[in-house]
Amino acid sequence: MGTILDKIVDQKKKEVAALYETYTPVKEKRKTRSLVKALEQFTVIAEVKRASPSKGDINLHVDVRKQVKAYEECGAGAVSVLTDGQFFKGSFYDLQTAREESSIPLLCKDFIIDKIQIDRAYEAGADIILLIVAALTKEKLKELYSYVLEKGLEAIVEVHDEQELEIAIQFNPHVIGINNRNLKTFEVDLSQTEKLGKRLNEEKLLWISESGVHSKEDMIRVKRAGAKGVLVGEALMTSSSIHTFFEDCKVNI
């Protein structure tokens, strides 16, 4: 029996095959917005997340335009959009809708295994592509990272443990994302940020913390560990007031 990640990657292979049958990448170049610049000060990357394998439906019928507008008005430094349909109920249409509404950097949050997915994300308006070390061979990661650069985009290279971190460091990526969620079990442990953050601070690399941040205390914890930003999804998608959440999570350390 495979892990959740195995099942997701198997589904992605089917989606990639379908994309090659139905989608022709556009050749046009466009301007992009920089997450690296946004991370010059500690910032929140606010996520549009309808559902997840671990939580089921979170906010299935969210108004993406309204949500993204609220994120930007409340001071988010970037917006992340889940584009996976099978497991997270997202879509590239959600990404495109977010682009139409937002003037800040936009992350395509998906399980990228092929260049054609990057082409599709680029066309939908992404500025940043998530590359997950756990989902890729080292050779494929190198190929996709190079393609992200070729497209004029930025990458977040995501890691969960020391072994993945050592692979990511070799690429000297724009941003490293420490995912506190184990994608094989979907369990969350915020201490991963503190463990792996020490190594990244030594290397003087730009990094963010992903998953498991629900409160001001969590925000303080990851900032003290050295993170330059934090990706928040579920907590914002279930909040009765996005404005109040941002106010509560303002940290000055």
From Swiss-Prot:
<dbReference type="Pfam" id="PF00218">
    <property type="entry name" value="IGPS"/>
</dbReference>
<dbReference type="GO" id="GO:0000162">
    <property type="term" value="P:L-tryptophan biosynthetic process"/>
</dbReference>
<dbReference type="InterPro" id="IPR001468">
    <property type="entry name" value="Indole-3-GlycerolPSynthase_CS"/>
</dbReference>
<dbReference type="InterPro" id="IPR045186">
    <property type="entry name" value="Indole-3-glycerol_P_synth"/>
</dbReference>
<dbReference type="GO" id="GO:0004425">
    <property type="term" value="F:indole-3-glycerol-phosphate synthase activity"/>
</dbReference>
<dbReference type="GO" id="GO:0004640">
    <property type="term" value="F:phosphoribosylanthranilate isomerase activity"/>
</dbReference>
<comment type="pathway">
    <text>Amino-acid biosynthesis; L-tryptophan biosynthesis; L-tryptophan from chorismate: step 4/5.</text>
</comment>
<keyword id="KW-0057">Aromatic amino acid biosynthesis</keyword>
<keyword id="KW-0210">Decarboxylase</keyword>
<keyword id="KW-0456">Lyase</keyword>
<dbReference type="InterPro" id="IPR011060">
    <property type="entry name" value="RibuloseP-bd_barrel"/>
</dbReference>
<dbReference type="InterPro" id="IPR013785">
    <property type="entry name" value="Aldolase_TIM"/>
</dbReference>
<comment type="similarity">
    <text>Belongs to the TrpC family.</text>
</comment>
<protein>
    <recommendedName>
        <fullName>Indole-3-glycerol phosphate synthase</fullName>
        <ecNumber>4.1.1.48</ecNumber>
    </recommendedName>
</protein>
<keyword id="KW-0822">Tryptophan biosynthesis</keyword>
<keyword id="KW-0028">Amino-acid biosynthesis</keyword>
<dbReference type="InterPro" id="IPR013798">
    <property type="entry name" value="Indole-3-glycerol_P_synth_dom"/>
</dbReference>
